[in-house]
């Protein structure tokens, strides 16, 4: 099957990760015939970040929310997991550095995701089912490929 790198715990492992199960429960309790997809969980993580930042602003400013306060509070977060939905990320003002943690999942013949790497609880499992290696992140200079492919294949 096809291997995919993921920063999010797969739905198929919801029994192991309470935040994923809570996300699925919220959908099933509040949405008729929910369409379970990773994009929804990514959006939920973004919403949780907004809610967390808005809550911090409300507490700091007697219940008053301003755009500037919410953006600043969100930018101050540098180890975001959405309560355990995904590996730690830095959603800072420039999107933060690429996260060094992830996992590989394989799409099986039924179209479901099966963990490929790391095995949970193994020495490769550095953090809640994710493998974390700072060497897995490399800087790619802007426009590195521009004009360097070949003259007959312009970008």
Residue ranges and their predicted role:
Residues 1-155:
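Extracytosolic ligand-binding ectodomains
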């Amino acid at each position: 099957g096809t291997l995919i790198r993921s920063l999010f715990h797969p739905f198929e492992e919801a029994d192991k990760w309470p935040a994923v199960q809570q996300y699925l429960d919220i959908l099933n309790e509040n949405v008729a015939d929910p369409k379970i997809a990773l994009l929804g969980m990514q959006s939920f993580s973004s919403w949780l970040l907004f809610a967390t930042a808005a809550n911090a602003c409300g507490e700091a400013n007697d219940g008053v929310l301003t755009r500037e306060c919410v953006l600043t509070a969100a930018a101050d977060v540098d180890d975001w997991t959405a309560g355990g939905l995904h590996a730690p990320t830095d959603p800072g003002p420039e999107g933060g550095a690429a996260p060094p943690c992830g996992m590989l999942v394989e799409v099986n013949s039924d179209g479901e995701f099966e963990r490929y790497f790391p095995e949970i609880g193994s020495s490769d499992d550095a953090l809640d089912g994710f493998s974390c290696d700072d060497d897995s992140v490399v800087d790619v200079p802007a426009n590195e490929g521009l004009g360097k492919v070949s003259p007959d294949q312009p970008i």
